[in-house]
């Protein structure tokens, strides 16, 4: 009986694979996100096309540098993703501006849903990412340079200079998502047990508690 089911299972898998590859392109001109709708199915539902306006495709927030004075890391990220530009819904792209104070850092983090390419607007940065084998790929980049961070790999940008710096970052996702290493591990809600982190990092529990004190849990 089990043997007789194999051809049926194989046929089902082939049909499913074909379905997964079908209609990969958009089936309408656009699908402006209806941010007021609580329903989410791997994205936002479409806004009524009759109610779409030019403002749905427009964002002015990247025109000027963001304030970095209140950032403990000396950096500020201004995102233009689907939550700020509803017209990006289903388009698979977004953009951000990152500003760095002198000595500023965009700490080690990853984007689980996107690769990233940065274009240096001003200044000089030390940037890099870690491969899954632990190799550091890093370089100093200058104004006008481009550097790429592969999807879901840990990466960072540091401004080691005495002048501000800024970049534009492009993503192949309308909502890349961001996980910063420090806050994710030491500021989770509910918290990761101290003994677990102590063993993972080869540290004593009091040291873990001290580090956690620097990362208040997100509400």
Curated annotation (Swiss-Prot):
Q: Which CDD domains match?
A: cupin_OxOx
**Keywords from the named record:** Apoplast, Disulfide bond, Glycoprotein, Manganese, Metal-binding, Secreted, Signal
Glycosylated position list: 70
Signal peptide extent: 1-22
**Disulphide bond pairs:** 31-46
InterPro entries per the record?
Cupin_1 (IPR006045), Germin (IPR001929), RmlC-like_jellyroll (IPR014710), RmlC_Cupin_sf (IPR011051)
Which amino acids does the record list as binding Mn(2+)? Answer: 109, 111, 116, 155
Parts forming coiled coils? none
Where would you find this protein in the cell?
A: Secreted, Extracellular space, Apoplast
Sorted alphabetically, the Gene Ontology cellular component annotations on this record are:
apoplast
Role played: May play a role in plant defense. Probably has no oxalate oxidase activity even if the active site is conserved.
Q: Which family does it belong to?
A: Belongs to the germin family.
Quaternary state and interactors: Oligomer (believed to be a pentamer but probably hexamer).
What this protein is called in its record is Germin-like protein subfamily 2 member 3
Say which species the protein is native to.
Answer: Arabidopsis thaliana
Tell me the lineage of the source organism. Answer: Eukaryota, Viridiplantae, Streptophyta, Embryophyta, Tracheophyta
């Amino acid at each position: 009986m089990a043997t007789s089911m194999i051809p049926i299972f194989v046929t089902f898998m082939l049909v499913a694979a074909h379905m997964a590859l079908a209609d990969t392109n958009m089936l309408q001109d656009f699908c402006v996100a209806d941010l007021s709708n609580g329903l989410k199915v791997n994205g936002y539902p479409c806004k009524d096309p009759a109610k779409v306006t030019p403002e749905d495709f427009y964002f002015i927030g990247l025109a000027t540098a963001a304030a970095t004075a209140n950032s403990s890391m000396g950096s500020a990220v201004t995102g233009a993703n689907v939550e700020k530009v509803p017209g990006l819904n289903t388009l698979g792209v977004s953009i951000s501006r990152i500003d760095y104070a002198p000595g500023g850092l965009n700490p080690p983090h990853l984007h689980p849903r996107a690769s990233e390419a940065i274009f240096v607007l001003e200044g000089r940065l030390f940037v890099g990412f870690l491969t899954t084998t632990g190799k550091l790929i890093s370089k100093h980049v200058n104004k006008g340079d481009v550097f790429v961070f592969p999807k879901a790999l840990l990466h960072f940008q540091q401004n080691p200079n005495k002048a501000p710096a800024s970049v534009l970052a492009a993503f192949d996702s309308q909502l890349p998502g961001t996980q910063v290493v420090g806050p994710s591990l030491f500021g989770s809600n509910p918290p990761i047990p101290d003994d677990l982190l102590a063993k993972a990092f080869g540290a004593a529990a009091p040291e873990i508690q001290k580090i956690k004190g620097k990362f208040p849990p997100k509400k």
